[in-house]
Design a protein with these regions (language model features):
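Preference for extracellular/luminal or secreted protein segments
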Residues: 4, 47-66, 71-79, 83-131, ...
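Bacterial N-terminal signal peptides that target proteins for export
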Residues: 14, 18-35
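Sec-dependent N-terminal signal peptides of Gram-positive bacterial secreted proteins and lipoproteins
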Residues: 29-52
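Second-shell residues forming the walls of enzyme active-site clefts
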Residues: 102, 144-161, 165, 247-405, ...
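Hydrophobic faces of well-ordered beta-strands that scaffold small-molecule active sites
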Residues: 109-115, 134-137, 169-173, 223-224, ...
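Glycine-rich, aromatic-flanked loop segments that form ligand/cofactor-binding clefts
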Residues: 157-187, 207-227, 248-272
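Active-site-proximal loop/short-helix segments
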Residues: 182-187, 221-239, 243, 269-285, ...
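Glycine-rich anion/phosphate-binding loops
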Residues: 198-210, 246-249, 295-296
């Protein structure tokens, strides 16, 4: 589709040029207007062309076909830091890009999905080409070496750039240090608890920057870290910097600055605070019975400090906080999202913990959780479950918008935040505005 503004600009140009369209060659008057018309029209067509999609769901608006279990699976350039790249593209360009996306394309940007192996396969290529997904998450079983990871990421990024209007993928890993270290080429670093015991924020910042630079070398642009949970509860343990929110706050903020120095998207997690939970959300839904005063004074301060330090993404956990919302876990709760936006003051990208975890699946299917999370205000959804569940979740969100259960404005707001994040950290100069 031709940009209406460009058509207006073209019409104005033609009016100006028509007056000066007669020149003399060999002393004979020649009209250049037909030639000018042809060149300008060709210029518009070239400028607005987009690579064809193969039976794109975005072009048809139909619900994606369901893949079956029988279907067989078949060096990004160094990016500038956030401060360097923030001025590469006018701020209003993200809104323009959002307006150019179909509903199906926009919804796809909200999904960060798991990959099945160590190289691109039919399913992940289908998710990129036909659902326009916003990112992938890589686990230890996806990454054998830096070179293999780099090759896989490069191939998937090229596919995304080709098929989604030059929008790159979020490529996320869990690389916290200690026992949560999924990238085998990254130098081992001690767990957060050991770093916290040092009491030295400079150490936290240095470690985060080293991790970030080593991830970046393989094309990984997002770390689902740091953990800014306070306390050593179930599933967290030594992943936390400590049980003192003041200590966790300064260590977490330092880690955010370290990732920022490396040009990596960091993620403060798990809001409101998994460190106080007695149950692991991978296996069940934790209930944290803190009153609101404790939430405000103990659970939230590290997240506030991370936001003040410039963290671009916050992960909401599968945690039931009755003082916040007695019915829904934070990842599916409008009240929890509102608390994060208004009380903590975060205006960046909110991403859910993996919707394939039992802590949320006990309350329904992955597709149902996806609709609830988007309705609650989450911007991005992590889904590491099998391809069929990923496709079902995507289709459910698209259907939810079409049926009026999710507002189009909410989708647009989320995708605008996602594209601003990508513009700041990921977009290459070759992509243009």
């Amino acid at each position: 589709m031709v940009d209406p503004q460009r058509m207006i600009d073209t019409e104005c140009s033609l009016r100006r040029l028509a007056k000066a369209s007669i020149v003399h060659i060999d002393h004979r008057p020649v009209s250049l207007l037909p030639m000018l018309l042809m060149l300008i029209v060709l210029g518009i067509s070239a400028g607005c062309s987009v690579p064809d999609r193969e039976a794109s769901y975005g072009s048809t608006g139909s619900e994606p076909e369901q893949s079956t279990a029988k279907e067989s699976a078949t060096n990004e350039p160094r990016k500038s830091t956030a401060k360097e790249s923030a001025t590469n593209e006018p701020e209003q360009s993200t809104s323009r890009k959002v307006s150019q996306l179909s509903l199906e394309e926009a919804v796809g940007q909200m999904f960060v999905v798991g990959v099945g192996g160590t190289e691109p396969d039919y399913y992940i290529e289908k998710m990129i080409r036909e659902r326009n997904i916003g990112g992938i998450i890589l686990h230890d079983y996806n990454m054998q070496s830096k070179e293999q990871t780099q090759a896989m990421v490069s191939e998937l990024q090229k596919l995304s750039i080709k098929t989604s209007r030059c929008i790159p993928l979020i490529v996320a890993v869990d690389q916290e240090g200690g026992r949560v270290s999924s990238a085998p080429w990254v130098t081992y670093h001690p767990p957060a608890a050991a770093v916290g015991q040092s009491g030295d924020p400079a150490q936290a910042q240095r470690i985060a920057e080293e991790i970030g630079r080593q991830l970046d070398a393989a094309g990984v642009n997002t770390d689902l870290a740091p953990v800014v949970d306070t306390g050593f509860g179930a599933a967290i343990g030594d992943r936390s910097f400590g049980s003192d929110p003041h200590l966790v706050s300064k260590m977490g903020a330092a880690a955010v600055r370290g990732f920022e120095a490396a040009g990596i998207i960091s993620t403060a997690k798990h809001f409101p605070n998994h460190g106080a939970a007695k149950v692991d959300s991978h296996t069940s839904l934790p209930v944290v019975d803190h009153d609101m005063q404790t939430v405000l004074s103990y659970d939230l301060p590290p997240f506030k400090r991370a936001v003040e330090a410039g963290v671009p993404m916050v992960m909401v956990g599968h945690l039931l906080y009755p003082a916040i919302d007695p019915e829904r876990p934070a990842s599916l709760s409008p009240k929890a999202i509102k608390l994060l936006r208004q009380e903590v003051g975060f205006d960046g990208v909110i991403i859910t913990d993996d919707l394939a975890m039992e802590g949320v699946k006990q309350r329904g299917t992955v597709a149902q959780a996806a609709v609830k999370a988007v309705s609650a205000g989450a911007d991005m959804l992590i889904i590491s479950s099998p391809p069929q569940e990923q496709a079902d979740a995507y289709a459910a969100v698209v259907r939810g918008v079409k049926q009026g259960r999710i507002s189009q404005d909410q989708i647009n707001d989320s995708v605008d935040r996602i594209l601003k994040l990508k513009q700041q950290y990921l977009l290459r100069n070759s992509c243009g505005p």
